[in-house]
């Protein structure tokens, strides 16, 4: 069976250690050898990122340059209109074939609101969900029915993620990193130091392009 590939989407405005450190820890926990970062195309009716699509993509590339675990995929940024997560995952599944194990990485905060996503009940028919812990969020879902859905698909065995192409949920005990892109943008606007929040090469790019001022 092909090796497990995991996809991790985000605005990455900018990418920072709060993205990279938990996902790196997750990769070690479950034996991932490939994580694909996918910067999001933000819908026009939502607040737009402060950095352009290309700048967000380039910062993601810089952040993982030389790290064999990560690659960056710009397919979402190439779209003329934003798409639902399930659409992207179904396209990836079609590319990879029926038998390839696919994972989609989300934070604990997203798991708690997953039932509001478009066609959320179809997600596990396409991929596994790999969930990174997030500070300050509860560990149970909103209703008994949702909790039962989680319990029915939950696995504590990483090998399940490699031996099955989709259908499992893995709750990873990853480091709780209290860094957010909002905090970084605010610190930049206040002239505060950010060197411990994101890779030096990304901070250098931000400085050179005058971002988040």
From Swiss-Prot:
InterPro entries: Cyt_trans-like, NadD/NMNAT, Rossmann-like_a/b/a_fold. It catalyses: nicotinate beta-D-ribonucleotide + ATP + H(+) = deamido-NAD(+) + diphosphate. Gene3D superfamilies: HUPs. Pathway: Cofactor biosynthesis; NAD(+) biosynthesis; deamido-NAD(+) from nicotinate D-ribonucleotide: step 1/1. Pfam families: CTP_transf_like (PF01467). Catalyzes the reversible adenylation of nicotinate mononucleotide (NaMN) to nicotinic acid adenine dinucleotide (NaAD). This is Probable nicotinate-nucleotide adenylyltransferase. It comes from Pectobacterium atrosepticum (strain SCRI 1043 / ATCC BAA-672) (Erwinia carotovora subsp. atroseptica).
């Amino acid at each position: 069976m092909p090796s497990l590939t995991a996809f991790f989407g985000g605005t990455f405005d900018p990418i920072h250690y709060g993205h990279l450190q938990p996902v790196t820890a997750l990769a070690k926990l479950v034996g991932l050898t490939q994580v694909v970062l996918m910067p999001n195309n933000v819908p026009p009716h939502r607040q737009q990122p402060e950095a352009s699509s290309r700048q967000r993509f380039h910062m993601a590339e810089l952040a993982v340059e030389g790290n064999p675990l990560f690659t960056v995929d710009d397919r979402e940024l190439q779209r003329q209109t934003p798409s639902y997560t399930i659409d992207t995952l179904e396209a990836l599944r079609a590319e990879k074939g029926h038998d390839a194990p696919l994972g989609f990485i989300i934070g604990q905060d997203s798991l708690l609101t997953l039932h509001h996503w478009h066609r959320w009940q179809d997600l596990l028919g396409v991929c596994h969900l790999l969930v990174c812990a997030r500070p300050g969020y509860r560990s149970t879902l909103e209703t008994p029915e949702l909790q039962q859905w989680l319990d029915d698909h939950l696995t504590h065995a990483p090998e399940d993620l490699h031996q099955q192409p989709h259908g499992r949920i893995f709750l990873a005990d990853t480091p709780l990193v209290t860094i957010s892109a909002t905090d970084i943008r605010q610190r930049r606007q206040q002239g505060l130091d950010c060197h411990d929040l994101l890779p030096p090469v990304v901070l250098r790019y931000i400085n050179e392009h005058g971002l988040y001022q």
